[in-house]
């Protein structure tokens, strides 16, 4: 079975995914591989799957509460949106039975993980996959360590290459992930360039699994911005934004050029907390200036 071994969290609920779980699958069920890929994986495990798909957030909250969902599968950004919708519905997070979230389909930072775990009171695990290979399940974090994604090496051979030269890089060096399928009968791929940036970690994991791990995806090689000679990944900016109270993880980066200089403009989505925080800070600053 492809699942994370159970551990415990502070409320004494198990984490991971087992046959006894009720899995709320909020990945899209259209042409996107996430929905059906996760669906059939949960069925193979023997757990109960709720094929909710994306959208209809109020309905999702109702189903999650009515069916007693224990595991949430979605994009990390949608998990945060769900957390707000749960509160808007007048429900207490503690009354839900969720204990684990399995999130993928988009890059996300450790700051975002901390926010999800805090708002939903779950353990948030990262899962990796891509349509060309097999969808979700190429690699997943264990609930014991949450420190890198274990690659299913009986099915996939992974390498790291220099994205510019294509030369292989040793373990520990960051670069582009290349995947060779070992068990696919339909459309096998040899040294497929994913454009995903990560590194291989060969240090034994404390969970005891011997499969090598890849670090959290840092971004795509074609997402990397070079601003005045400095390599910048959107996830680095996201980490800074999420440290500011009142700023949501929804943002837009606009790169332009003035003369010979690159200009990066960051547009963010904010809520009322930001204005109240900034307002109090400005009020204190103005008060000090008046007294002086």
State where each predicted segment sits.
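Active-site glycine/GP-rich loop and adjacent strand/helix microenvironment
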Residues: 45-292
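Conserved AMP-binding loop of ANL adenylate-forming enzymes
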Residues: 13-49
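Conserved ATP-dependent adenylate/AMP-binding module captured primarily in the ANL superfamily
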Residues: 9-22, 57-69
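Short, small-residue-biased leader/transition segments that mark boundaries at the very start
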Residues: 3-10, 287-290
């Amino acid at each position: 079975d492809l699942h994370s071994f159970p551990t415990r969290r502070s409320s004494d609920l198990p984490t991971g995914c087992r046959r006894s779980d009720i899995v709320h699958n909020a990945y899209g069920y259209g042409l996107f591989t996430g929905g059906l890929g996760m669906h059939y994986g949960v069925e193979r495990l023997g757990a109960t799957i709720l094929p909710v798909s994306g959208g209809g957030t109020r309905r999702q909250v109702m189903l999650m509460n009515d069916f007693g969902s224990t595991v949430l599968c979605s994009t990390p950004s949608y998990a945060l949106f769900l957390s707000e919708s749960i509160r808007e519905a007048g429900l207490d997070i503690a009354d839900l039975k969720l204990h684990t979230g399995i999130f993928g389909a988009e890059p996300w930072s450790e700051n975002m993980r901390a926010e999800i775990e805090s708002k939903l009171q779950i353990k948030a695990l990262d899962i990796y996959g891509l349509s060309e290979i097999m969808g979700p399940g190429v690699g997943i974090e264990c609930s014991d360590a949450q420190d890198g994604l274990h690659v299913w090496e009986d099915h996939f051979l992974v390498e790291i290459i220099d994205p510019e030269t294509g030369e292989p890089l040793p373990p520990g060096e960051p670069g582009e992930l290349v995947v060779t399928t070992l068990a696919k009968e339909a459309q096998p791929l040899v040294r497929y360039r994913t454009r995903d940036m990560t590194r291989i970690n060969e240090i034994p994991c404390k969970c005891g699994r011997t499969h090598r791990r890849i670090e959290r995806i840092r971004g795509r090689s074609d997402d990397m911005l070079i601003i005045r000679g400095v390599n910048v990944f959107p996830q680095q900016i996201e980490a800074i934004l999420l440290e500011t109270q009142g700023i949501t993880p929804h943002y837009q980066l606009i790169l332009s050029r003035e003369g010979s200089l690159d200009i990066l403009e960051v547009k963010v989505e904010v809520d009322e907390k930001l204005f109240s925080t900034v307002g109090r800070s400005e009020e204190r600053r103005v008060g000090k200036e008046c007294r002086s």
